[in-house]
């Protein structure tokens, strides 16, 4: 294969074996190094390609470049709340910052920045308000209309302004189950049949709604009762993704060890109850188990529940679970993580980590 070089140099000589004719592109004004051109060796070859020492100007938008600059050094996501920085300026979202401090406390080590290994603590690190404001101005897509808005305005747009946001009929109180985009609401309400139903028909619907309301009140009353217990503990937990060692690996999640009620615990989670190919299912669920790692002198009966953490917006319906932990029986069964639907589950799976808050209530005999 012939090689044509307009000017000898190490850049051109290193292109041997690429299966293409090589030349160099003229740079206007003679400034800077010449750029290497790869031309197809015959008419049936692939389209023309150019190797650039850097991307074409304007090929990557500014906001896309800023994502990698302003992301958290730990989870690599854009922070959703406060942004902290180490003494060398490396950025951490509030959730990861708290977890670094908690992990160091459990290991009896000094917490360090994952980038530069300088010491970090609540007194050594400070918030970076400039970065927080910059992130709030970065564009983000509305999940309903797919238009872009600054992050600071997105929540208001989704709740109050978006014409495609999911809304409910005003006759929901008398049993209308309709849900749809906001721009169809007026047409539906003008045609809704519920206002014309008889009293007897409405009574049946209202009875069903009363039963649902009664179950919700039982849950909240149970939570209020648990809050009166003597021994209550809570902590922020971070589920991190791992893969099994099987021939066909499976995704699972596990938290670092944490301490609640003077005991050491671990949480594990799995997708679709570890079914063989969860990627082929349109329905996504997460289930979790609580594991007691420390030894206990007597059976330890506990109630526990997971809620959304302070730095995330995942939608979870609280469910109270109960278990008696002993040295021989220290793992609960896998129980459902009460996410409202598969869409919310996919949001969690798409994130680098899953941040939640765990409450444990010890039942005294």
Curated annotation (Swiss-Prot):
Give the Pfam families listed for this entry.
Sina_RING (PF21362)
**CDD domains given in the database record:** CYHR1_C, RING-HC_CYHR1
| Stored InterPro entries | Sina-like_RING (IPR049548), ZFTRAF1 (IPR039338), Znf_RING (IPR001841), Znf_RING/FYVE/PHD (IPR013083), Znf_TRAF (IPR001293)
Q: Which gene encodes it?
A: zftraf1-b
Q: Which GO terms describe its molecular function?
A: zinc ion binding
The lineage's top-level taxon is Eukaryota
GO cellular component terms?
A: cytoplasm; nuclear envelope; nucleus
Stretches annotated zinc finger (RING-type): 72-117
- Give the organism the record lists: Xenopus laevis (African clawed frog)
Gene3D superfamilies per UniProt = Zinc/RING finger domain, C3HC4 (zinc finger)
Name this polypeptide is given: Zinc finger TRAF-type-containing protein 1-B
Q: Where is this region: Disordered?
A: 1-56
